């Protein structure tokens, strides 16, 4: 990715700190946590919480940007405590997930920021600790003082702060 910045193919990227080349400038945007999302018509939608047994017994949907992956951060957290879940659907975008959840009894674990404004869905805390993540914005020294780029980075930081839940 460093080469893409150096050649001007990428101006700003939203990354996690772990995936950011150390040669780039960075700015923290937000810290994210995970929640469970399910249809308001799901049999467990009236619960204030899900037990670990209930959670593991459900059919789950997973978002995997390359598509087809049936294993994610939730599965790593479950494996650490000797448990597993049943992922029966993998989609490549969070954009399609809410509609799928509305019309099925699938449960999904999603970043909390993406569970805001989801009519017909219920948000519940996960029954186990699922490590969240941080998002940062990164840019190359080539554009560090460029007024247009500074403006863009300020707008991105401002928008990241306005998303509250």
Where in this protein do the model-derived segments appear?
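Short beta-strand-centered segments that line the small-molecule binding cleft or hinge
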Residues: 1-38, 120-126
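Short Pro/Gly-enriched coil loops immediately N-terminal to beta-strands
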Residues: 24-40, 48, 52-57, 126-135
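A late-sequence structural motif
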Residues: 47, 52, 123-165
